[in-house]
Amino acid sequence: MTYARPADRAGALRLHLNENTGGCSQAVIDAIRQITAEDVAYYPDYSALLKECAEYLGVREAQLVLTNGLDEGLLAATVNGFRVAQPAAGLPEAIVPAPAFEMYSVFVKAAGGRVISIPPKPAFEFQLREICGAVTERTRLVFLTNPNNPTGQIIPREALREVARYVPADVTVFIDEAYFDFCGETFLPEIDAHPNVIIGRTFAKAHGLAGLRAGCLIGDAGRLNDIRNVVPPYSLSVFAVAGWRAALGDRDYLGWYRTQVEESKELLYRAAGRLGLQYWKSGGNFVLINVSRVGDPADFVEAMATRGILIRDRSQDPGCGGCIRITAGLVRHTEVVIEALEGLCAAAS
């Protein structure tokens, strides 16, 4: 299995990858412009960024690993989870509740493991009993996304506790909080009580640093020491370090963009309701909408693209038949996509 990156179209409105459609803070651009030729020639120094990021998150530096995007953190956690405790027989296993971010399965298979997929429930309720029932002596990882992508559903904290308590101590429970900034739900206050939990965060979404690749892992210091043996020593560029530090200092930009996303989601909910389309309220910066009533989702996505708007076909995800996913970003962009959505629905009537 490989990750198939959705096609881009020059000049199109990008509402297909859950990026920050408002760009990044001007402070980030200003910081990058201060980089000198000497800075580029030398390997980057992470020490100040590590300190500032730990303070921003409210954790100790020993509980934090900085990564080249959250993807690098996911890969490192997967490789380490399989490396430190091989099962007596058979392939190491990772439990992945569906639907889920595709890279979990890609990384598990690349690391020589087997994916145990947990089918979704009808209303995308969290599959607590099914996850616990899938744990075997070969289980090494459990991937949980909170909120989920692509459904946007939030996992109750007590359910996360149940999983962390149920699995053996050598099993890593990876909680992917890529969309934390849009819902505020986090397991971070619980990490000292659950040393088998690793939390993944990204600064690509709300902070607008997707092009710089800025992610991190948070968890037990001992477990993260093992992961540091997997992460390259200089995987962040000097541009990422400078931009990341600047982004951490601009809380006003973060607050402004969160407000834009919340308003955009409300607009999408109301539009879908008016059009008689099923949708799910989301804890992320996106909304999942079922368009099967008015047409095939692949055709719908292509029709949007011809109008200069890129959205994502999620109809092949388990439980998501007929669904598209639309990034909720700037309100003015959302108004454009809603106008197109209304036009396509009217044409299909």
Question: What are the roles of these predicted feature ranges?
Answer:
Residues A54, K109, L128-E137, P150-A206:
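Active-site pre-lysine segment of PLP-dependent enzymes
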Residues Q26, V294-V301, H333-V336:
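Short, conserved charged micro-motifs
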Residues F82-L144:
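PLP-dependent aminotransferase-like
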Residues A303-R307, Q316-S349:
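PLP-dependent enzyme catalytic core of the Aspartate aminotransferase-like
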Residues P122, E262, R274-R307, I324:
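Conserved PLP-binding catalytic core of the aspartate aminotransferase-like
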Residues M1-E72, A76, A348:
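N-terminal small-domain helix-loop-helix segment of the aminotransferase-like
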Residues S25, N196-W280:
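PLP-dependent aminotransferase class I/II
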